């Protein structure tokens, strides 16, 4: 008989390609590693449409913000694997069709 936890883990959605190979868990290193990956793949000054296309391809949900001072746009993708939920977020600003500011965050919440 297969344990229920093993079956649930096997059903979890995959990690998005942008985060593959990075540490997961509740540590500052996990959040920092995702931010560094985002910064290296889409450095400020690069074309914003490339970032948006990649995030959409990876099934991130993109949202515009008028209420935040720091970033105009964000995208998030979550992966639920009971009892936990991983969430990756990317925040950015655009000026003249280029990324002017960028930040990636990762979080893990468990019951």
Question: PLM ranges: what are they?
Answer:
Residues 1-4:
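Sec-dependent signal peptide recognition
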Residues 53-88:
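A cross-family detector of function-defining hotspots
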Residues 18-53, 58:
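Terminal, regulation- and interaction-focused segments at domain boundaries
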Residues 80-109:
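Amphipathic N-proximal alpha-helical interface segments
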Residues 8-10:
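C-terminal motif of bacterial Sec signal peptides marking the signal peptidase cleavage site
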Residues 12-15:
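Bacterial signal peptide processing site
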Residues 18, 67, 91:
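Cys/His-rich zinc-coordinating "finger/knuckle" motifs
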């Amino acid at each position: 008989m297969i344990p229920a936890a093993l079956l649930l883990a096997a059903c979890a959605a995959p990690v998005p390609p942008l985060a593959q190979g990075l540490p997961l868990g509740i540590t500052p290193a996990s959040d920092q590693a995702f931010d560094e990956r985002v910064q290296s793949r889409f450095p400020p000054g690069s074309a914003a449409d490339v970032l948006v296309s990649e995030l959409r391809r990876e099934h991130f949900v993109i949202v515009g913000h008028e209420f935040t001072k720091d970033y105009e746009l964000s995208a998030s993708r979550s992966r639920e694997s009971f009892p936990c939920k991983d969430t990756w977020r990317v925040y950015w600003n655009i000026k003249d069709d280029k990324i002017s500011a960028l930040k990636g965050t990762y979080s893990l919440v468990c019951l």
